[in-house]
């Protein structure tokens, strides 16, 4: 008394070559979406960017000081 396999119908999704509005939802209200993301995550972005910029600035400063040290 085993189970009998059931045939499932395949679902095929296709886009019409004549359809022009394929990804309109992606671009709809884009400035509002960007503003929302920035206003929600500005603390996280600051905490990510600050150490990276600080490290880069320190490396450039150290390199410049090392170059100037050999002048005298």
Swiss-Prot record:
It is a single-pass membrane protein. Disulfide bonds: none annotated. InterPro entries: Cyt_b-c1_8-plants (IPR020101), Cyt_bc1_su8_sf (IPR036642). Residues 1-41 are mitochondrial matrix. SUPFAM superfamilies: Ubiquinone-binding protein QP-C of cytochrome bc1 complex (Ubiquinol-cytochrome c reductase) (SSF81508). One of its GO terms (cellular component) is cytosol. Residues 59-72 are mitochondrial intermembrane. GO terms for biological process: mitochondrial electron transport, ubiquinol to cytochrome c. Coiled coil: none annotated. Belongs to the UQCRQ/QCR8 family. PANTHER family: CYTOCHROME B-C1 COMPLEX SUBUNIT 8, CYTOCHROME B-C1 COMPLEX SUBUNIT 8-1, MITOCHONDRIAL. This is Cytochrome b-c1 complex subunit 8-1, mitochondrial.
